[in-house]
């Protein structure tokens, strides 16, 4: 079971009700969330992702309950293997291999939700140093799903947790391409190397 539990009781809004609200977007929050229903470069819906999600995102089921179970399923059914994938690997291939790193887990979950016309965004940040989490002391990625009547619910399928104080959000977007830590073109001769170290500690 995923831990920790949400601080507040989650609404019983069903998957169908969430789709309808996103389509009609009757308020500013659902309107802002609507852009995260659509495919993006690294997190697009696909038939196999839709089929995978159908087992969990069932008609009449509360969406919040369903996305928590979906995150747990990905955590259990996919293997965390550093350097087993690259950002250029198609999402369908990542899904077929059932292995990867945090950005792959996040893209798979986002792709599943978008296949069901639900809003999900990619969150980039860091984990608290010393925590017994996969991906600690390096950049990390997780998912945020839009729950009408609640807002955005963060889920970390890599570690099967609901992110709280141990997760430090830096940015969010449609997928990794929106929040890359380094982007651009470098011109000139000579070799280059980037060396980065990160340590996250509580502020007392």
Where are these regions (language model features)?
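Glycine-rich, N-terminal phosphate-binding loop and its surrounding beta-alpha-beta segment
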Residues: 1-10
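Hydrophobic/aromatic-rich core segments of domains that either
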Residues: 72, 104-186
């Amino acid at each position: 079971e995923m831990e920790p539990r949400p601080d507040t009781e989650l609404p019983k809004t069903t998957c169908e009700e969430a789709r309808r609200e996103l389509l009609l977007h009757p308020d500013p929050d659902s309107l802002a969330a609507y852009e995260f229903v659509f495919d993006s470069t690294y997190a697009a819906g696909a038939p196999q992702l839709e089929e995978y999600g159908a087992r969990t995102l069932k008609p009449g089921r509360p969406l919040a309950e369903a996305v928590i179970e979906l995150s747990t399923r990905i955590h259990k059914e996919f293997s965390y293997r550093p350097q087993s994938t690259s950002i250029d690997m198609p999402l369908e291939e990542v899904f077929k291999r059932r292995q990867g790193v945090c950005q792959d887990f996040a893209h798979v979950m986002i792709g599943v939700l978008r296949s069901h016309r639900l809003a999900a965004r990619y969150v980039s940040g860091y984990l608290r140093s010393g925590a017994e989490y996969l991906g600690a002391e390096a950049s990390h990625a997780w998912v945020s799903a839009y729950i009408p009547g609640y807002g955005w619910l963060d889920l970390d399928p890599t570690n099967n947790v609901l992110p709280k104080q141990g997760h430090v959000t830096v940015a969010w977007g449609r997928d990794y391409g929106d929040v890359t830590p380094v982007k651009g073109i470098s011109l000139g001769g000579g070799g280059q190397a980037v060396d980065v170290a990160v340590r996250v500690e509580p502020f007392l």
